[in-house]
Regions:
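N-terminal juxtadomain amphipathic helix
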Residues: 57, 67-68
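Short hydrophobic/aromatic beta-strand element in the GNAT-like acyltransferase core
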Residues: 68, 78, 148-149
Length: 249
């Protein structure tokens, strides 16, 4: 199947209703994608040790010779794995990985991954499940706003299971740390209360390339072509909607 087979050529890009959206924000992590050199080992660990079922394993859309796997945390939250044939296997602590949940690592890299359960009882049950598979666990630890256990996963992953929700920003934004981060009192109020946005009937035009803004890294010509394409062209050209194993009719 080609990418253009999945969506009719005349299919328009999705549209939205014009409205002020005071609470518009991402409401969770749909999937966190982790690079791997051993898809089977990762899926096996997450199923056996953590109880997370494998929900998808297929050729990654638009990427040659690359596997994409998903394990389920909940119905709208997954851990994903990407096995590209050129993925390096070397771990360099402090650069590619943090050595432990409190260790330094390159900015933008994953420091540790914390997964939610509802109660301390479930945290302790997860501790026992993980230990029953021979994996050592540190904790529990009460951080005040969350209660956590810490352990390691394949390929140098630093993992955490915790319970806790509804963090009170009036208690948990330390003025000393705020100042050391160069954040003024006015700025912290803006960070605590992001401004609403008014979304119009017409899509916001793609902004011009600006090196001062975050950008995905592609070869220059490829990047300009992708960012210069219309939303409808991307929707029609890159969408792949058919699962690899269709349900029987």
């Amino acid at each position: 199947m080609t990418t253009t087979d999945a969506v009719p050529a005349a299919s328009p890009a999705p549209t939205i209703e014009a409205v002020i959206r005071p609470h518009l924000r991402p409401r969770g992590v749909n999937h966190l994608a982790i690079s791997t050199t051993d898809m089977k080992a990762q899926l096996t660990y997450w199923a056996d040790v953590l109880g997370c079922p494998t929900k998808a394993l297929y050729w990654m859309h638009g990427v040659d010779n690359t596997f994409h796997g998903f394990v389920e945390l909940s119905g709208d939250s997954y851990i994903a794995f990407v096995q590209h044939p050129d993925n390096p296997s070397e771990v360099e602590y402090g650069v590619t990985h943090a050595a432990n949940p409190g260790a330094p690592v390159t900015g933008g890299a994953t420091q540790h991954i914390a997964m939610h359960v509802d109660t301390l009882d479930e945290v302790l049950a997860m501790r026992d499940r993980i230990r029953s598979h021979g994996v050592q666990v540190m904790g529990p630890i009460d951080h005040g706003m969350i209660k956590s256990i810490y352990f390691a996963g394949p390929e140098g992953l630093n993992l955490e299971v915790c319970c806790g929700s509804d963090i009170d920003e009036n208690q948990w934004i330390d003025p000393e740390v705020q100042g050391l981060c160069g954040i003024s009192d006015d700025e912290v109020e803006r960070l605590k209360h992001p401004a609403p946005i008014e979304i119009g009937e017409s899509p916001v035009a793609q902004p011009a390339t600006d090196s001062s803004k975050p950008q995905m890294s592609y070869p220059s010509a490829v990047y300009e072509a992708l960012m210069g394409a219309s939303d409808a062209d991307i929707w029609n050209g890159a969408s792949e909607t058919s699962p690899p194993v269709p349900l029987p009719e």
